[in-house]
């Protein structure tokens, strides 16, 4: 069989990531460096490194930022406590929280005010989960996995609703909800799907190429939830092997031994140049035929954060 690449589409940048990265670039143009960013603007080492070279400074907490400095909140969102701390320091805040994450924040606020206890399906410690749960810390409990759904101790069970992190495995989330419903039949669903369109689309594309691939390569960083999920989805849907890497030069040539078909995709925070670099490496290894496998068309564009909206150019 001739060596070939199955290139998943959609892949790479989603609308929220594109918006956040442009926000940092625009802030640097307008205000000049340094511009401070709380946490990584998106979870990709290449993107963060590129922005650092342009003058962005990434910090873990707002108390590391000089008073009055231009500060950007990452795409993953923040809690009200972080907003309060930023205001106390007089920071010039540009909020690059993804609008789809903000939607979940609003759901938390609305349900908690209505007396609901919220089971937030997600990964404890992830910045998005910390920001979301911070909007009602006494009314939110994080459920990390289907197995945890079987045993988690819920203090208030009369009015329950489940919400989720936006970058989870669709299938694993459905399994978690199924198990929660066995214990709490009255648990309410969110008003709309919390897992974002880009996460779902990228997983659907991987499901299409996985059973046809001897190896699936996911370009993405280790701390990128949606990239890690793509590896899991590939393995769960028929790929003989799957790996994640940040850069093409990390690819171990031994992985290509006896491999005829390589599936390629990338996480939602990955610029296309990194995929192109990988395709060049694969071409040199004999994988010159590239077939695009498209499962959806994405044309969503978010407006830039307040204060940066006059131009996206």
UniProtKB/Swiss-Prot annotation:
The UniProt record gives the binding positions of isopentenyl diphosphate as 43, 76, 126, 224-226, 269
Q: Which cofactor does it need?
A: [4Fe-4S] cluster
Q: Does the keyword field hold Transcription regulation?
A: no
Q: Which organism does this sequence originate in?
A: Tropheryma whipplei (strain TW08/27) (Whipple's bacillus)
Q: What is this protein called?
A: 4-hydroxy-3-methylbut-2-enyl diphosphate reductase
Q: Where does (2E)-4-hydroxy-3-methylbut-2-enyl diphosphate bind?
A: 43, 76, 126, 166, 224-226, 269
The record's section on Gene3D superfamilies has: 3.40.50.11270, 4-hydroxy-3-methylbut-2-enyl diphosphate reductase, catalytic domain (3.40.1010.20)
The active site of this protein is located at 128
The residues listed in the UniProt record as binding dimethylallyl diphosphate, with positions renumbered to this chain, are 43, 76, 126, 224-226, 269
Q: Which GO terms describe its molecular function?
A: 4 iron, 4 sulfur cluster binding; 4-hydroxy-3-methylbut-2-enyl diphosphate reductase activity; metal ion binding
């Amino acid at each position: 069989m001739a060596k070939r690449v199955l290139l998943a589409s959609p892949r790479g940048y989603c609308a929220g990531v594109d918006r956040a990265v442009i926000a940092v670039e625009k802030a640097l143009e307008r205000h000049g460096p340094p511009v401070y960013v709380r946490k990584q603007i998106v979870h990709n080492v290449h993107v963060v490194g590129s922005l650092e070279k342009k003058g962005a400074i990434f910090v873990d907490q707002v108390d590391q930022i000089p008073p009055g400095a231009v500060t950007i909140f990452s795409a993953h969102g923040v809690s009200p406590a972080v907003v309060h701390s930023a205001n106390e320091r007089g920071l010039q805040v540009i909020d690059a929280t993804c609008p789809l994450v903000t939607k979940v924040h609003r759901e938390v606020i609305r349900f908690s005010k209505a007396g609901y206890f919220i089971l937030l399906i997600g990964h404890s410690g992830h910045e998005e989960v910390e920001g979301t749960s911070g909007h009602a810390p006494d009314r939110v409990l994080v459920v990390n996995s289907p197995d945890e759904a079987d045993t988690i101790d819920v203090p208030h069970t009369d009015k329950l609703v489940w919400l989720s992190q936006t970058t989870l495995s669709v299938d694993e989330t459905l399994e978690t909800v199924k198990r929660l419903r066995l214990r709490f039949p009255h648990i309410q669903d969110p008003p709309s799907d919390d897992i974002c369109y880009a996460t779902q689309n990228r997983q659907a594309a991987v499901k299409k190429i996985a059973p046809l691939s001897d190896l699936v390569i996911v370009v993405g960083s280790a701390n990128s939830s949606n990239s890690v999920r793509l590896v899991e989805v590939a393995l769960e849907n028929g790929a003989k092997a799957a790996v994640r890497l940040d850069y093409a030069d990390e690819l171990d040539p031994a992985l290509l031994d006896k491999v005829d078909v390589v599936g390629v995709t990338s996480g939602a925070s990955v610029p296309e140049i990194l995929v192109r670099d990988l395709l060049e490496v694969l071409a040199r290894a004999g994988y010159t035929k590239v077939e695009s496998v498209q499962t959806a068309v994405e044309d969503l564009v978010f407006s830039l954060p307040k204060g940066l909206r006059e131009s996206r150019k």
